[in-house]
Amino acid sequence: MNIIRRASSIFDKLIVCVMVNAGKNPMFTQKERVELIRRVTGDLPNVEVDSSNELLAEYARRRGSCVVVKGLRAVSDFETEFQMALINHKINPDLDTMFLTADSQYMYLSSSMVKELGAYGVDLSDFLPTEIIPDFQERIESRKKQF
């Protein structure tokens, strides 16, 4: 949310697009993630939440977007995101990438770390928007029951 809130103050319209990443195993489906993000961005009138299974560069072209905003937590994030920015620009020369560094209190966070903390019953209010903590805890509990 840190990056979304800051980017929404920079742009007249911000589209948050939930994409599919075959290399990740998300806790929520794409549709569920869209709904969760809509819930926590409801107070931001210039934010639209969407989803796509196409390449980001193609999605941006179709939507008429000229800038992609990416959040960075660490130097290792930059290496990966820089490569993606170059590829996206190659596919869609009208597309630029803007990098925003996460505020310092979020730099160490990762989704896997938050999942693990949640599995151990740690209070997640410092890590997640309060509106979605119950959804997160419910999903963790249902996964525990599977094992």
Where do the model's predicted regions map?
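Nucleotidyltransferase catalytic core that binds NTPs
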Residues: 1-147
